[in-house]
Amino acid sequence: GTAGTYFPLGGAIADILNKNVPGANASAQSTGASVANINLLQQDKVDIAFVQNDIAYYAVNGSEMFKDKKVPSIQGLATLYPETIQIVTLDKSGIKSLNDVKGKRVAVGAAGSGTEANARQILEAYGITYDDIKVQYLSFAEASNALKDGNVDVAFVTAGHPTAAIQDIATQNHVVLLPVDSDKADALIAKYPFYTKLTIAAKTYPNQEADVQAIAVRAMLAVTDKMDADTGYAITKAIFSNLDRLKAAHSVANAVSKATALDGMSVPVNPG
């Protein structure tokens, strides 16, 4: 859809390519989320797509929502910025750590979504399975209402931070973000190469007095192996030479840099 971060950034990238890459005829298309975008790449309906690096990994490896539907042709141009896995509870729940969630009502994301896979993998790192919790398959819009109404105890959301929906809950409630401890994060990164560590700085949300250690997946630009190296190079060079245009389109682009463009690269890189 047009409400997220991909659409304004896609428009900016199309603009950059049309001005800097000879013969480019780029336009931004409003699509579904990462899974839909992988399918569009596979069907040759688009040449470049924004996807989360975890979804790209599942596609190339034929796992999770791509079980029995492997898409080996997917390649990466660059990873762009983090999509933080935020684990939200309210102060009154008394939950201070993921070790405390056994027996609790946990919203893990919509069934079959990237968020749901993130939640399952993180809980697994803590030795917790869905049998140990009361699992609720809710989108974050549904989960935020359920948190406010006291119908769930903890909710997972994967989104660049600060996330508007969490800010919204925090206006009326004392929100607490649960950390992913460093040793657990290291174990997750060793097993799933799409994860990276990051810190949600103190004061990102109201009442948040301390930094919170988190892990993130990364938004990336994906193509297929049909894109030749020269084109891949020209596109990547144009984008990284015009980052100011991206930053003007959306604040998440402040995190985009050449230095981190291979962080969390979970699929083969286009030779360009």
Identify what each model region corresponds to.
Residues 21-23, 33-36, 43, 71-72, ...:
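Extracytoplasmic
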Residues 1-25, 82-149, 244, 267-272:
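Bilobed "Venus flytrap"/periplasmic-binding protein-like clamshell domains
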Residues 67-80, 204-213:
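A structural signal for short loop-to-beta-strand junctions that line the ligand-binding cleft
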Residues 11-15, 27-68, 95, 141-146, ...:
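Pocket-flanking alpha-helical
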Residues 84-95, 192, 214-231:
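A bilobed periplasmic-binding-protein/Venus flytrap-type ligand-binding module shared by bacterial periplasmic
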Residues 42-51, 104-106, 149-157, 172-176:
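Alpha-to-beta junction loops
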Residues 15-36, 43-45, 123, 150, ...:
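N-terminal secretory/targeting leader peptides
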Residues 138, 142, 149, 159-179, ...:
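An extracytoplasmic/periplasmic, membrane-proximal ligand-sensing/linker region
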